[in-house]
Curated annotation (Swiss-Prot):
Its cofactor is Mn(2+). Disulfide bonds: none annotated. GO terms for biological process: gluconeogenesis. Pathway: Carbohydrate biosynthesis; gluconeogenesis. This is Phosphoenolpyruvate carboxykinase (ATP).
Length: 536
């Protein structure tokens, strides 16, 4: 085996059982990985110098093919209602077969870190057969100082071989695609998919498992910090405005997707961004556009024209086109990835039913209720006049990545909110004046004005009313914001129709929460819509 590149000589891939590989390249930089990826026929150069790769059959995550090893230590710590078990015996067969498959191959290794807080960092080794995957994960995680690589020792290893096909009968899995996590031994095996996001989300899943045991809250959120050191956390599912609203020229971006909240404050898990690229434009998102069109960035499933110019409006490969770049490509990004305890928590939702107000203040119990609910609404479609929205509840605003029971995360969040006196707000970026198809999208100018007032603390001084349906506190007015949108019922042409729609949404919340009722105390149960008085 020929090993090249800076690494710990006592910690080579042979220690992982990969000694039969033909060549192993450790910790190559961007230029080197570009050369390998292009020479291997994996990717091509765009007109502006980004590296474009296509992933074939898999253009998104494969949640149905993700497994967690069920052993003595995970038996009672994993939320098995939401995680598929794999026996240690099946995992061992899978490991042996993947190692055998790697024999004679060229492999790429990156030694990286998950977590900007040294006390809670997860040193991670990622072994890939694709050079562009190596660049992707190098962009997404935190790069240790080069001089430390010769002594690097990982706590998590990811082995990703897209050309490996799992055998459901032999390995106890669902298909030829597999993402198998052995949380006890810190090993993730990925096969049968080239979608690069599996690498990133595997690190997130492991951190989400390890950190709560240390009293650290892992969060699927974006975060920023103001000039006075006042940090804010933005929870929200896809399409709610998490990335857009946390990108504020007056505030420093900590990160756009995954963070921890520990003893000293919040910290980014990552060192990069994995931005959606569909319909990306220099007018709407100039910073992301600039970061996307430059050397060092990986474009995933973005269509190029004959001159190698990316067409960000072309969704012929997938709607889920992506751009992966290091955080320092964004001008206003934090250099440390660390900030103090949050002053404000924002929970974003895009309510297509047109019921929720543009902003509401939450008690700690209401915050836990809405965190466990993880609500947003998707528009079913516009064809043939279909206008009925579809409610989506993804607990903790990231159910696919939460190995433990949601109540563990919810209780930890509530405890931290109380301990640090954090102001919590629910922000609706969805529809006003009616449901989707009748009403209109919440004006972004109004959302930003309300958000700014919440972040500066000015909104706390407003007068509030108690929402008749949800029991949270809604401001009556704010300078520069049309008072009508603060009262959703008044924006509907038919008040009775609003009441019926609100009742319908309340019942969806209540029905969804039944699975959590036995895991929370009476104060959180009483925070259900229509039952609790507003925040003081």
């Amino acid at each position: 085996m020929n090993e090249l590149g800076v690494h710990n000589p006592a910690n080579g891939v042979a220690e992982l059982g990969l000694g039969e590989a033909s060549r192993v390249f450790y910790n190559l930089n961007e230029s080197e990985l570009y050369e390998h990826a292009i020479r291997n026929g994996e990717a091509e150069l765009t007109i502006d110098g980004a590296l474009r790769a296509v992933t074939g059959q898999h253009t998104g995550r494969s949640p149905k093919d993700k497994f967690v090893v069920r052993d003595a230590s995970t038996e009672n710590t994993i939320w098995w209602d939401n995680n598929k078990p794999l026996s240690p015996e099946n995992f061992e067969l899978l490991r042996q077969d993947m190692l055998a498959h790697a024999a004679g191959k060229t492999l790429y290794v990156q030694d990286l870190i998950g977590g900007a807080d040294e006390e809670n960092a997860l040193p991670t080794r990622v072994v890939t057969e694709l050079a562009w995957h190596s660049l992707f994960i190098r962009n997404l995680l935190i790069r240790p100082k080069r001089e430390t690589l010769s002594g690097f020792s990982q706590k998590l290893t990811i082995i990703n071989l897209p050309s490996f096909k799992a055998d459901p009968a032999r390995h106890g899995v669902r298909s030829e695609t597999v993402i198998a996590c052995d949380l006890t031994n810190g090993l993730v095996l990925i096969g049968g998919t080239s979608y690069a996001g599996e690498n990133k989300k595997s690190v997130f899943t492991v951190l989400n498992y390890l950190l709560p045991a240390k009293g650290v809250m892992p969060m699927h959120c974006s975060a920023n910090v103001g000039p006075e050191g006042d940090s804010a956390v933005f929870f929200g599912l896809s399409g709610t405005g998490k990335t857009t609203l946390s990108a504020d020229p007056a505030r420093t971006l900590i990160g756009d997707d995954e963070h921890g909240w520990g003893e000293h404050g919040i910290f980014n898990f990552e060192g990069g961004c994995y931005a959606k690229a569909i319909k990306l434009s220099s007018e709407a998102e100039p910073e992301i556009y600039a970061a996307t069109n430059r050397f060092g960035t990986v474009l995933e499933n973005v269509v190029l024209d004959e001159s190698r110019v990316p067409d960000f409006n072309d969704n012929s490969l997938t709607e889920n086109t992506r751009s992966a770049y290091p955080l320092h490509f964004i001008p206003n990004a934090s250099e440390t990835g660390i900030a103090g305890h949050p002053k404000t928590i924002i929970m974003l939702t895009a309510d297509a039913f047109g019921v929720l107000p543009p902003i509401a203040r939450l008690t700690p119990e209401q915050a836990m209720y809405h965190f466990l609910s993880g609500y947003t609404a998707k528009v079913a479609g516009t064809e043939k006049g279909v206008t009925e929205p579809e409610a989506t509840f993804s607990t903790c605003f990231g159910a696919p990545f939460m190995p433990r029971h949601p109540a563990e995360y919810g209780n930890l969040l509530r405890e931290l909110i109380g301990k640090h006196g954090v102001d919590c707000w629910l922000v609706n970026t969805g529809w006003t004046g009616g449901a989707y198809g009748i009403g209109k999208r919440m004006p972004i100018k109004a959302t930003r004005a309300l958000l700014t007032a919440a972040l500066t603390g000015d909104l706390k001084n407003a007068q509030f009313r108690t929402d008749a349906n949800f029991g949270f506190a809604v401001p009556l007015s704010l300078d520069g914001v049309d008072g009508a949108i603060l009262d959703p019922r008044s924006t509907w042409a038919d008040g009775a129709a609003y009441d019926a729609q609100a009742k319908k949404l309340v019942s969806m919340f209540v029905s969804n929460f039944t699975k959590f009722e036995d895991h929370v105390d009476s104060k959180v149960r009483d925070a259900a819509p229509g039952l609790l008085l507003a925040a003081e």
